[in-house]
């Protein structure tokens, strides 16, 4: 079996992203080809987290579950999504939700509670998708969802905007990827970067 390691460090895709003077030199042809990865679906939407409309919310959905490993900062001051992720003990995850514009850091109990609410909504909707798409559907639990948050520190976490965008994220999930879709996901998590950053590595594990 082949495992894929994909590094996405960016976030925002509308055609205007490529017209923006700061990133006008970025061309999709400049990036390596990125292959389809079985078992992965992804989608991006605008949750209106920025004044200028852009993709700012990305969902990775692992229909069969994904084994994962985490490396966390050693700092004692961490964001609420890291507190959530460190408590996840499931062997597999089924969803990874990433937002930009807000780091969910120094947001206190409200920031953590927001993730708890989102995980309940997202796990329920992904369970419904399992029922629609799979022969042997699984009930996905809130503790099988991980969060990535990046952006401004100390601002109230935009719970309402993100929750209201989840149905659209689910509807837009695509099981087949190509370079454009990976680019869109990378641009959906971009904060201060001027260009999207994408890379892929394939490795064989075991005999």
Language-model regions: role of each:
Residues 67-89, 190-204:
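Glycine-rich oxoanion-binding loops at beta->alpha junctions
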Residues 120, 124-128, 139-207:
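Glycine-rich, mobile lid/loop segments that gate access to catalytic sites or pores
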Residues 100-130:
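Alpha-helical support elements that line or immediately flank enzyme active sites
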Residues 51-55, 88-95:
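N-terminal glycine-rich anion-binding loops that anchor highly charged ligand groups
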């Amino acid at each position: 079996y082949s495992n894929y390691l994909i590094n996405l460090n960016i976030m925002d895709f509308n055609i205007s992203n490529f017209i923006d003077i700061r990133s006008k030199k970025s061309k999709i042809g400049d990036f390596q080809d990125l292959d389809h990865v079985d078992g992965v679906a992804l989608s991006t939407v605008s949750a209106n987290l920025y004044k200028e409309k852009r993709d700012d919310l990305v969902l990775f959905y692992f229909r069969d579950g994904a084994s994962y490993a985490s490396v966390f900062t050693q700092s004692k001051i961490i964001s609420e999504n890291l507190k959530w992720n460190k408590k996840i003990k499931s062997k597999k995850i089924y969803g990874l939700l990433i937002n930009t514009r807000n780091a969910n850091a120094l947001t206190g109990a409200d920031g953590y509670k927001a993730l708890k609410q989102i995980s309940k909504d997202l796990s329920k909707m992904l369970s419904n998708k399992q029922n629609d798409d799979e022969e042997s559907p699984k009930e996905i639990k809130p503790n099988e969802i991980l969060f990535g948050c990046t952006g401004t520190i100390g601002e109230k976490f935009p719970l309402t905007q993100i929750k209201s965008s989840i149905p659209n994220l689910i509807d837009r999930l695509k099981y087949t990827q190509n370079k454009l879709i990976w680019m869109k996901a990378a641009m959906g998590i971009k904060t201060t970067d001027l260009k999207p950053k994408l890379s892929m590595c394939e490795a064989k594990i075991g005999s």
